Structures are given as structure tokens and as C-alpha cells.
Amino acid sequence: MDARLLEILVCPICKGPLSYDRAAQELICNADKLAYPIRDGIPVMLVDEARQTVEGTPVDLNPGSVA
């Protein structure tokens, strides 16, 4: 995911910032607890295509890193 693109993309619902989950190939809106898929390198920013993240379980945005 291009960092410049990530800077301008926002959640289509709340217009808040998104975080990139490299392992899952998703863009995460923490405010709405939604994950938007990235297919063939293209973010799919359609609400109907988003999945809800598990409530109370944080999405690991940096897999493999030591906290």
C-alpha cells in the first residue's frame, strides 16, 4: 500500500483515518470497527464489502513486532 494513498483515503462512513493491515490486506477504521479489503492492490472502499472487526479484539496492525 502506497503511503501517499493511505494518507488521503478515509473511512467512507465517518471520514476518519484508516490503518493498513499488511498481513490481512485490509484497511482498518478503528472508530467504526470495520475492515475494508484490498484486492489486487486496490482498496475496496464500499461499505457493503467491509467486514466488522471482532468487538473487543484489537486488529494486529504490526504482526511479528514485539510490543
From Swiss-Prot:
UniProt-listed Gene3D superfamilies: 2.20.25.10
Organism: Paraburkholderia phymatum (strain DSM 17167 / CIP 108236 / LMG 21445 / STM815) (Burkholderia phymatum)
Protein name: UPF0434 protein Bphy_0537
Segment forming the signal sequence: none
Alphabetized HAMAP family for the sequence: UPF0434
Cited InterPro entries: Trm112-like
Family: Belongs to the UPF0434 family.
PANTHER family: PROTEIN PREY, MITOCHONDRIAL (PTHR33505:SF4), ZGC:162634 (PTHR33505)
Pfam families named in the record: Trm112p (PF03966)
CC per GO annotation: cytosol
